[in-house]
Amino acid sequence: LICHRVHGLQTCEPDQKFCFRKTTMFFPNHPVLLMGCTSSCPTEKYSVCCSTDKCNK
């Protein structure tokens, strides 16, 4: 599983998805992007799950 990310490519295990989420838990006016491979991607706001080379918003 290879997902396009902001800078380059991210490779995940076959049974995993690449997920990134915007959060502001550290700086209220400065969004932080959390990203990584996971087996289940949460469907909360600002989440994007990737499969193969396409992302579903």
Curated annotation (Swiss-Prot):
Tissue distribution of the protein: Expressed by the venom gland.
GO cellular component: extracellular region
Keywords, sorted A to Z: Acetylcholine receptor inhibiting toxin, Disulfide bond, Ion channel impairing toxin, Neurotoxin, Postsynaptic neurotoxin, Secreted, Toxin
CDD domains according to UniProt: TFP_snake_toxin
Site (Key residue for inhibition of muscle alpha-1-beta-1-delta-epsilon (CHRNA1-CHRNB1-CHRND-CHRNE) and important for inhibition of neuronal alpha-3-beta-2/CHRNA3-CHRNB2 nAChR) residue list: 25
Substitution effect: residue 26 to A: Important decrease in inhibition of rat muscle alpha-1-beta-1-delta-epsilon (CHRNA1-CHRNB1-CHRND-CHRNE) and no change in inhibition of neuronal alpha-3-beta-2/CHRNA3-CHRNB2 nAChR
Residue numbers marked as site, Important residue for inhibition of muscle alpha-1-beta-1-delta-epsilon (CHRNA1-CHRNB1-CHRND-CHRNE) nAChR: 24, 26
Site (Key residue for inhibition of muscle alpha-1-beta-1-delta-epsilon (CHRNA1-CHRNB1-CHRND-CHRNE) nAChR): 23
Molecular function GO terms recorded: acetylcholine receptor inhibitor activity; ion channel regulator activity; toxin activity
Effect upon mutating residue 29 to A: No change in inhibition of rat muscle alpha-1-beta-1-delta-epsilon (CHRNA1-CHRNB1-CHRND-CHRNE) and small increase in inhibition of neuronal alpha-3-beta-2/CHRNA3-CHRNB2 nAChR
Localization (cell): Secreted
Disulfides per UniProt: 3-19, 12-37, 41-49, 50-55
Residues forming coiled coils: none
One Pfam family per UniProt: Toxin_cobra-type
Site (Important residue for inhibition of muscle alpha-1-beta-1-delta-epsilon (CHRNA1-CHRNB1-CHRND-CHRNE) and neuronal alpha-3-beta-2/CHRNA3-CHRNB2 nAChR): 7, 22, 30, 45
Site residues, Key residue for inhibition of muscle alpha-1-beta-1-delta-epsilon (CHRNA1-CHRNB1-CHRND-CHRNE) and important residue for inhibition of neuronal alpha-3-beta-2/CHRNA3-CHRNB2 nAChR: 27
Effect of residue 46 to A: Small increase in inhibition of rat muscle alpha-1-beta-1-delta-epsilon (CHRNA1-CHRNB1-CHRND-CHRNE) and neuronal alpha-3-beta-2/CHRNA3-CHRNB2 nAChR
Main localization category: secreted
Sites marked Important residue for interaction with muscle alpha-1-beta-1-delta-epsilon (CHRNA1-CHRNB1-CHRND-CHRNE) and neuronal alpha-3-beta-2/CHRNA3-CHRNB2 nAChR: 46
Effect of residue 22 to A: Small decrease in inhibition of rat muscle alpha-1-beta-1-delta-epsilon (CHRNA1-CHRNB1-CHRND-CHRNE) and neuronal alpha-3-beta-2/CHRNA3-CHRNB2 nAChR
Function: This toxin binds and inhibits rat muscle adult alpha-1-beta-1-delta-epsilon/CHRNA1-CHRNB1-CHRND-CHRNE (IC(50)=3.1 uM) and fetal alpha-1-beta-1-gamma-delta/CHRNA1-CHRNB1-CHRNG-CHRND (IC(50)=5.6 uM) nicotinic acetylcholine receptors (nAChR). Shows a very low inhibition on rat neuronal alpha-3-beta-2/CHRNA3-CHRNB2 nAChR (IC(50)=50.2 uM) nAChR. Binds to the acetylcholine-binding pocket and acts as a competitive antagonist. Does not inhibit human glycine receptor (homopentamer composed of alpha-1 subunits, GLRA1), but seems to potentiate it (about 2-fold increased activity).
Note: Negative results: does not inhibit human alpha-7/CHRNA7, alpha-9-alpha-10/CHRNA9-CHRNA10, alpha-3-beta-2/CHRNA3-CHRNB2, alpha-4-beta-4/CHRNA4-CHRNB4, alpha-4-beta-2/CHRNA4-CHRNB2 and rat alpha-3-beta-4/CHRNA3-CHRNB4 nAChR. Does not inhibit human GABA(A) receptor (heteropentamer composed of alpha-1-beta-2-gamma-2 subunits and homopentamer composed of rho-1 subunits).
Family, similarity comment: Belongs to the three-finger toxin family. Short-chain subfamily.
Protein name listed in UniProt: Neurotoxin Oh9-1
